[in-house]
């Protein structure tokens, strides 16, 4: 009966028979909630550590990927420049071949002309020798 009147006044006895303002059930629920919150905070902290580690790993992989990408772009550009150099060199060689062909044709014409002059000179010498 005394407990009921105290309960109505908002005072309660706990399991150790100490006078409390909170209802023992509410106090126990509060304690349980506090424990659950502590566990939740610990789990969140662990989760943040795991996520932080994953973010660092992903950042490292992104950096490595970017480095490899730059290397690949550099290699591709080098291959393109080598191909352009070869093409330019090929064009130079074609131009040199054309120039040499023209020079060869000039030499043939000059040779034919010199052969004709030589033949005329031999003919002139032969006629000169016959007239003597």
Swiss-Prot record:
UniProt function note: Involved in ciliary process assembly. May play a role in the trafficking of ciliary membrane proteins from the Golgi complex to the cilium. Regulates the platelet-derived growth factor receptor-alpha (PDGFRA) signaling pathway. Plays an important role in spermatogenesis, particularly spermiogenesis, when germ cells form flagella.
Chain coiled-coil ranges: 87-112
Major site of localization recorded for this protein: Golgi
Cellular component terms per the entry's GO annotation: centriole; centrosome; ciliary basal body; ciliary base; cilium; cytoplasm; Golgi apparatus; intraciliary transport particle
Keyword annotations: Cell projection, Cilium biogenesis/degradation, Coiled coil, Cytoplasm, Cytoskeleton, Differentiation, Golgi apparatus, Spermatogenesis
Gene symbol of the encoding locus: ift20-b
Biological process according to GO: cell differentiation; cilium assembly; protein localization to cilium; regulation of platelet-derived growth factor receptor-alpha signaling pathway; spermatogenesis
Species per Swiss-Prot/TrEMBL record: Xenopus laevis (African clawed frog)
Compartment(s): Golgi apparatus, cis-Golgi network; Cytoplasm, Cytoskeleton, Microtubule organizing center, Centrosome, Centriole; Cell projection, Cilium; Golgi apparatus
This protein's name: Intraflagellar transport protein 20 homolog B
């Amino acid at each position: 009966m005394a407990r009921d009147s105290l309960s109505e006044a908002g005072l309660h006895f706990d399991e150790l028979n100490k006078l409390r303002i909170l209802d023992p059930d509410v106090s126990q629920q509060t304690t349980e909630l506090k424990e659950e919150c502590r566990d939740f905070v610990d789990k969140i902290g662990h989760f943040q550590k795991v996520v932080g580690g994953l973010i660092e790993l992903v950042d490292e992989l992104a950096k490595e990927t970017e480095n490899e990408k730059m290397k690949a772009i550099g290699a591709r550009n080098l291959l393109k420049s080598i191909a352009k150099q070869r093409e330019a060199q090929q064009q130079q060689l074609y131009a040199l071949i054309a120039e040499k062909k023209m020079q060869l044709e000039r030499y043939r014409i000059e040779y034919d002309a010199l052969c004709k002059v030589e033949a005329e000179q031999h003919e002139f010498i032969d006629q000169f020798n016959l007239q003597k």
